[in-house]
């Protein structure tokens, strides 16, 4: 078997990626989230496949087809709730994975980091079109509001919106194409994930100390396969608790009402994992400015490798930047809270302050703290 996995053309790739891969001996549990994301993707593709067998992408039957899945299909309710809550688990793992990358300076592996940003954007697009499919009130109005933002693009905006809608409003054509996108995008995510791994294995993994670990590496199997298995079991435990005991806790009550273009919900908001970006969008009174801020809230991650002037790798020995990092995380939580609140005082003001803080932390505070720490080292 050992000879086969080392020499067989196909098994050799698997062997170099998951078995004999030289891995730093000191990587912590924060490095588990890559494998957990892979597990989440597999769960989402499998549950999504079974849901697609019973779902109909037609405005007249979409809502009732989801009800049919939950009531009449064997374990349909479980598949549906695993898929819905699996998306939340996916984003929790994604945010922790990105947060770990920022904390430990993984952004210096620029190709891997940039592919990761593309993966994040693709996953957000997939989740958005997926949220429209049940065709509840929040699905319909969420699709209307978010797609309508594209009309802020000069010259081509209105044409682009109508092209995406497939008509003059969100309707049957929109739902059908969103279903097509939602079906194909996870496979594109899987392809990007392989490219992400390819670039990562070219350079080797980062580690908590931020030091070169070439002299101290161990094989991935059995040490990190067992470690990842523990993480996977814990993820499945949390997912099953969510799906079985609190299936609707992360959903929106408005989505239990079929879509009605004549009745607007009191407060239109996306799923919880988009609320931070939604709060940034709403904090700018200008439509085009809001759209640009929304896009930049994700794309600004690409600035981390460019703004990195620190002589040290990661934040493990950098107390000043550590404080700024945790302010950044707390600020993100504030933005998430604000995104779910109505557009009124004092929430609008808090949102504007938090939005400015979000960008200022990355563009100003972290580079300044890098310079301060570099000067402290010289003393």
From Swiss-Prot:
Q: Which cofactors? A: heme b
Binding annotation for heme b b566: 97, 196
Question: GO molecular-function annotation terms?
Answer: metal ion binding; ubiquinol-cytochrome-c reductase activity
Q: What is its main location?
A: mitochondrion
Bilayer topology annotation: Multi-pass membrane protein
Protein origin, superkingdom = Eukaryota
Q: Name one GO cellular component term.
A: mitochondrial inner membrane
- Describe how the cofactor binds: Binds 2 heme b groups non-covalently.
- Where does this one sit in the cell? Mitochondrion inner membrane
Tell me which Pfam families the record gives. Answer: Cytochrom_B_C, Cytochrome_B
Q: Name one GO biological process term.
A: mitochondrial electron transport, ubiquinol to cytochrome c
> What biological function has been recorded for the protein in this entry?
Component of the ubiquinol-cytochrome c reductase complex (complex III or cytochrome b-c1 complex) that is part of the mitochondrial respiratory chain. The b-c1 complex mediates electron transfer from ubiquinol to cytochrome c. Contributes to the generation of a proton gradient across the mitochondrial membrane that is then used for ATP synthesis.
Q: Which family does it belong to?
A: Belongs to the cytochrome b family.
Q: Know the name of this protein?
A: Cytochrome b
Q: Organism, per UniProt?
A: Akodon montensis (Montane grass mouse)
């Amino acid at each position: 078997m050992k000879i086969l996995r080392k020499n067989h053309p196909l098994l050799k790739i698997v062997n170099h990626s998951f078995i004999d891969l030289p891995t730093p001996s000191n990587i912590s549990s924060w490095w588990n989230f890559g494998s957990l994301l892979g597990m989440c993707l597999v769960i989402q593709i499998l549950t999504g496949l079974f849901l697609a067998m019973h779902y109909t992408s037609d405005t007249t039957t979409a809502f009732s087809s989801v009800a049919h899945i939950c009531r009449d299909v064997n374990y349909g309710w479980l598949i549906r709730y695993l898929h819905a809550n699996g998306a939340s688990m996916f984003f929790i793992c994604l945010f922790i994975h990105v947060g770990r990358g920022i904390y430990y300076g993984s952004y210096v592996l620029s190709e891997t980091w940039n592919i990761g940003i593309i993966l994040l954007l693709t996953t957000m697009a997939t989740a958005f079109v997926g949220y429209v499919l049940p065709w509840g009130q929040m699905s319909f109005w969420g699709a209307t509001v978010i797609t309508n933002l594209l009309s802020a693009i000069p010259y081509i905006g209105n044409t682009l919106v109508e092209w995406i809608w497939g008509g003059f409003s969100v309707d049957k054509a929109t739902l059908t194409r969103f279903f097509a996108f939602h079906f194909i995008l996870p496979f594109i995510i899987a392809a990007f994930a392989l490219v992400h791994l390819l670039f990562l294995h070219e350079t080797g993994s980062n580690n908590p100390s931020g030091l070169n670990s070439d002299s101290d590496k161990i094989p991935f199997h059995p040490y990190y396969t067992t470690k990842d298995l523990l993480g996977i079991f814990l993820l499945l435990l949390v997912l099953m608790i969510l799906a079985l005991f609190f299936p609707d806790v992360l959903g929106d009550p408005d989505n239990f009402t079929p879509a009605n273009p004549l009745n607007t919900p009191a407060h239109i908001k996306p799923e919880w994992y988009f609320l931070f970006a939604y709060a940034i969008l709403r904090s700018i009174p200008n439509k085009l400015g809001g759209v640009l801020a929304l896009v930049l809230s994700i794309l600004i991650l690409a600035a981390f490798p460019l703004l990195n002037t620190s002589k040290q790798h990661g934040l493990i020995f950098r107390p000043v930047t550590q404080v700024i990092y945790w302010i950044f995380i707390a600020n993100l939580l504030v933005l998430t809270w604000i995104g779910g609140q109505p557009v009124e005082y004092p929430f609008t003001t808090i949102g504007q302050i938090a939005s400015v803080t979000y960008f200022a932390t990355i563009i100003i505070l972290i580079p300044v703290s890098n310079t301060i720490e570099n000067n402290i080292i010289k003393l």
